């Protein structure tokens, strides 16, 4: 599915010229907190799906400079309420129930042939290799390509994501998708599948049994395992990528999908002593490939046992950008499990030591422990997607991966090796689309 400016239509917010999607773990929830909800409005023209997300009741912090208003979403801010806003689910059970309902509603829009294509057995190992950082023409995805659906079906598919994800998580995902559409429209890439996304269900949608939502395309691979009986949700494994890191949509709004991750990462880095930073940067940064086997390497680095309580919390804030994509309860429980083994977790860092995208080539870091593996890696290449005046390499091209060595895919399957030689970790200088090399011409 190709999305043009996923944050373009601001229906009730007035003159906002910069939108910076941030993910923040919501530590408190109150009854009067009505967060912004993104409502996909899909239209088809010239074979391209245009997505306009109406943002209402937006919680913002704003500063004014030269007549331009800058708005930054923040989960700790109180939100203005509007009749069209809905609140995030705050419990795991609510998320499972509303996501199952949205999935059933989506299935109801499909033909028998489409239903057969989108539904797999829960223990089908296909799901372990059908997600990737590569565009959809290079790695086969499971399920249905949203470009093959009607407008009604596309809207229903996006409602599944809206039910599954928190507001901040949904904003981050749609901003990633908007960035891929930006590359399609503005870059030198000849890859015409940019901006296309697939959706699949492994197991029947249910609030009483286990099933999975898989959604992804280039620089996006969500694997959400929901188990109503156990009352659990896990997003392990999930791939979030960004290219470019900053882009301007058709409404003139500046979109920064990973600004929240960068802010959290540098808050952690800056909290360290010089000695701790030296140990951290001397460590071994690892990167596992999306949709491939992983040895969850630790290597040398700074351990959780070396951190103060405050530093541990800042590290958990970083991790929450991946494990906390859904509701508050799910996030709290996942972080508690990770915190219990944090002393055994190894963190390593390479690259820049200040958050300044105007200098250097970006950062890479990894966090590897008994039940968490997060890797963040700047790609030293544009993958043939160059844009005049816009950085699409280093800071501007990032791959991330989140996995749980103890609970990938809700322990429903064993990870298989990537097929077709497309399992490369996407390290700096690696070849291939999305990995620093140029995709072949079509």
Which residues does each predicted region cover?
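Residue-identity detector for glycine
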Residues: 5, 14, 57, 67, ...
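Exposed, low-complexity/repetitive linear segments and helix-based recognition motifs
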Residues: 5, 12, 29, 84-85, ...
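Bacterial lipoprotein signal-peptidase II cleavage site
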Residues: 55-85
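Intrinsically disordered, low-complexity terminal tails and inter-domain linkers enriched
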Residues: 24-35, 83, 426, 430, ...
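Sec-dependent bacterial lipoprotein signal peptides
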Residues: 1-56
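A cross-kingdom marker for long, charged
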Residues: 88-112, 116-148, 155-166, 171-442
């Amino acid at each position: 599915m190709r999305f043009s400016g996923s944050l373009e239509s601001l229906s009730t917010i007035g003159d906002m010229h910069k939108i910076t999607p941030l993910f923040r773990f919501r530590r408190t929830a109150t009854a009067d907190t009505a967060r912004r909800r993104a409502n996909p409005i899909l239209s088809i023209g010239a074979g391209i799906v245009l997505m306009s997300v109406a943002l209402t009741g937006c919680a913002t912090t704003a500063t004014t400079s030269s007549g331009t208003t800058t708005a930054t979403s923040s989960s700790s801010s109180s939100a203005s309420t509007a009749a069209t806003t809905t609140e995030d689910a705050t419990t795991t059970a609510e998320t499972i129930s509303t996501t199952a309902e949205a999935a059933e509603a989506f299935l109801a829009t499909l033909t028998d042939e489409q239903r057969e294509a989108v539904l797999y057995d829960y223990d089908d190992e296909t799901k372990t290799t059908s997600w990737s950082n590569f565009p959809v023409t290079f790695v086969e995805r499971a399920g249905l390509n949203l470009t093959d659906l009607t407008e009604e079906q596309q809207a229903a598919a996006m409602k599944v994501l809206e039910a599954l994800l928190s507001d901040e998580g949904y904003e981050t995902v749609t901003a990633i998708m908007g960035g891929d559409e930006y590359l399609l429209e503005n870059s030198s890439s000849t890859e015409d599948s940019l901006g296309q996304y697939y959706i699949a269900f492994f197991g029947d949608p249910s609030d009483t049994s286990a099933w999975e939502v898989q959604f992804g395309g280039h620089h996006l691979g969500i694997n959400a395992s929901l188990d109503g009986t156990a009352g659990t949700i896990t997003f392990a494994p999930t791939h979030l990528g960004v290219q470019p890191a900053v882009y301007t949509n058709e409404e003139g709004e500046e979109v920064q999908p990973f600004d929240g991750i960068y802010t959290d990462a540098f808050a952690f880095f800056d909290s360290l002593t010089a000695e701790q930073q030296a140990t951290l940067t001397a460590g071994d940064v690892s990167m596992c490939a999306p949709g491939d086997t992983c040895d969850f390497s630790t290597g040398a680095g700074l351990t959780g046992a070396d951190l103060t309580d405050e530093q541990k919390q800042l590290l958990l804030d970083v991790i929450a950008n991946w494990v906390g994509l859904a509701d508050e309860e799910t996030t709290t429980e996942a972080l508690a499990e990770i915190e219990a083994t944090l002393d055994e977790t190894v963190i390593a860092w390479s690259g820049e030591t200040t958050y300044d995208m105007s200098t250097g080539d970006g950062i890479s870091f990894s966090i590897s422990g008994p039940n968490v593996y997060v890797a963040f890696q700047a790609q030293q290449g544009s993958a043939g997607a160059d844009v005049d005046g816009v950085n699409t390499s280093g800071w501007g091209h990032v791959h991330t991966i989140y996995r749980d060595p103890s609970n990938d895919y809700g322990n429903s399957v064993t990870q298989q090796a990537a097929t077709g030689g497309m399992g490369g970790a996407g390290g700096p200088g690696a070849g291939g689309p999305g990995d620093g090399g140029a995709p072949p011409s079509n």
